[in-house]
């Protein structure tokens, strides 16, 4: 049960209605979280920003979706770990690839560029001490432009920070998520062991 209430039909504006409908079409962000966020003017601004960060920019959406899921499982957010972007699916992201996110370095499913982004997402989740190193950025520069690195960093920051907040809203508990996908507990244990 969410800790905040969803927006009521009588509270909708044309914009809040469109943001929720867009979430239903794209699959991410989930309409339930959009319904919570759109009860606040700054929440509406955040949903608009998140949609731009997620679906626009210079990085492929599929790459960002892989990083989002990797970080989400690391902080055991039931909601974030089970949400899937329809756009990323159309771009070729499969559940088999998602399973391989937790052994991305040894996977044949990912390019060197995708592995570099996933490594950065993994380090980002570990904390600022893990990414505040020249070598981290030298490794990224082999695969990404400065513009792409900025976008990747902003994206990981948003996923990590807002993901913690969304987890605390209890839209979907970790236990409920593990019922939907029993492999989540295994993946979370793998991430914790790293």
Predicted features and spans:
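Short, thiol/selenol-centered motifs that function as redox-active sites or metal-ligating centers
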Residues: 64-87, 159
């Amino acid at each position: 049960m969410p800790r905040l209430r969803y927006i009521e039909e009588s509270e909708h504006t044309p914009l809040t209605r469109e943001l929720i409908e867009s979430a239903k079409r794209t699959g991410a962000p989930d309409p339930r979280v959009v319904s919570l966020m759109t009860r606040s003017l700054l929440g509406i601004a955040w949903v608009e920003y998140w949609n731009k960060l997620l679906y626009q920019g210079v990085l492929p959406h599929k790459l960002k979706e892989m990083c989002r899921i990797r970080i989400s499982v690391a902080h055991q957010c039931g909601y974030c770990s089970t949400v899937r972007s329809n756009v990323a699916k159309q771009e070729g992201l499969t559940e088999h690839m998602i399973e391989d996110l937790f052994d991305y370095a040894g996977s044949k499913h990912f390019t060197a560029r995708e592995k570099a982004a996933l490594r950065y997402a993994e380090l980002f989740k570990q904390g600022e001490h893990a990414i505040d190193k020249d070598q981290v950025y030298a490794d990224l520069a082999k695969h990404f432009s400065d513009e792409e690195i900025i976008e990747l960093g902003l994206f990981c920051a948003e996923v990590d920070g807002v993901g913690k907040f969304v987890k605390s809203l209890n839209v979907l508990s970790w236990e409920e998520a593990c019922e939907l996908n029993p492999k989540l507990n295994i993946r979370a244990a793998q991430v914790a062991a790293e």
